[in-house]
Amino acid sequence: MPGGRRGPSRQQLSRSALPSLQTLVGGMCGNGTGLRNRNGSAIGLSAPPITALITPEPVRHCHIPELPVDGGLVFEFLFFIYLLVTLFTQYINIYKTVWWYPYNHPASCTSLNFHLIDYHLAAFITVMLARRLVWALISQASQVGTSSVVKYSALIIGRLVLLTLCGWIFCWTTVNLFRNHSVLNLLFLGYPFGVYVPLCCFHQDNRSQPLPTDCGYLVPDSLVHEGANGVGGLVRPKDFLSLLRESLREQFNSPPSIPSHSCPLSPDLIRNEVECLKSDFNRRIKEVLFNSLFSAYYVAFLPLCFVKSTQYYDMRWSCEHLIMVWINAFVMLSTQLLPPKYCDLLHRSASHLGKWQKLEHGSYSNAPQHVWSENTVWPQGVLVRHSRSLYKAVGSYNVAVPSEISHARFYFLFHRPLRLLNLLLVIEGSLVLYQLYSLLRAEKWNHTLSIALILFCNYYVLFKLLRDRIVLGRAYSYPLSSYGLKPH
């Protein structure tokens, strides 16, 4: 045998490696599972849980200032005025004339062909666009306290008169449209409602009862533990009439109140809060999409369906007008239903939720791995196994289910607090720049007038977005240590 220094044996090497491996990451988890070696087998070591050895970084929240937000009634009034302006410009695009020519050339001496306009259709569209404003007026009047019988009686009479007037105009215009137009044209009048009922009424995001405003903190503990395996315990089947009633009530109700956030410490409560906020956010987005498409449909598309076959209009410009109306209506409704305070609430919940990154098989084979536990708060960088896959903790505070795609999507959207605001700002800024470019290249008087009127409305929306972006950007960039906040 040649001489020389002999290294340690394989048994001695494995024995010396185990304590360092356990001390590095923390041994077994709180649910009785331990580390795993390269072959995937568990190493039975008695060690304290991982949260006792590696404390997750505490979650700190920024305090944002209270930014002014338009009230429900003020917003509905401004939104209704904007829709009326866009409806007026669409009628200009369709029924414009060359009124500056001498009288011996054209047969028209006015700027529009008023004799071709269907006033019953215009009144019908106006009533449909005013539905949210009328309901906001009634809701606002109902919330006002009345101390005398006379004021209360006047309030009831005013509500009845307003509803009767709107109902009479709606019925009168509908009857006249039935008399003067074909059945095919009349199908376009209620097309949005016909599409809304099957798409939205039967898809309620697995929820049957409205969740409390504090996102599940009033839910009993038994239901919280059942919700860890799925929120099916809170779901009860509904019939068609109940779904239809609830969906129509959502369309007419004022914007819902913003839920609260109390920085829960239990992983079950955090996941329950995320499920609640996810359902609330989906409902708000559904309302934004439907109302923006509804407004663009009745403002820019429905007048085109009732144009006579002998009437010429610029199809490309009318379609472009339709797209611009829809985009701006989408941004206006998003800024109202997704205010900065609500986006900050989603960001705080995402900070507590965390995220897991799925790794390929065979990677990090020498690193310690744990079995994921639903009752453990996992720090950043920890490797866990769940559903035969390997995941790495991305956030500083992780309680999300690794295989749950909705949790990863929620964290991606809201872990940066300005992501939604930046997206809306880019959309509105691009729209304004395109309208300015179109205004510079416009050669027809109706194009210039329509773009100028719509730009006047878009400037207000762009100003609000820029103001919120500048203020919130400064607030979120401020060091957290200067607030003197306690970690949650």
UniProtKB/Swiss-Prot annotation:
Residues bearing carbohydrate: N31, N39, N180, N206
UniProt keyword Ribonucleoprotein present: no
Membrane topology annotation: Multi-pass membrane protein
Domain of life, per lineage: Eukaryota
Keywords assigned: Glycoprotein, Membrane, Transmembrane, Transmembrane helix
Locations listed in the record: Membrane
Gene Ontology CC annotation, any one: endoplasmic reticulum membrane
UniProt xrefs under InterPro entries: Uncharacterised_TMEM39
Main location: membrane
Residues that span the membrane, as ranges: 72-92, 110-130, 155-175, 182-202, 287-307, 319-339, 420-440, 446-466
BP GO terms, sorted: negative regulation of autophagosome assembly; negative regulation of autophagosome maturation
Keyword Membrane included in the entry's annotation: yes
Protein family according to the UniProt entry: Belongs to the TMEM39 family.
Protein name, UniProt field: Transmembrane protein 39A-B
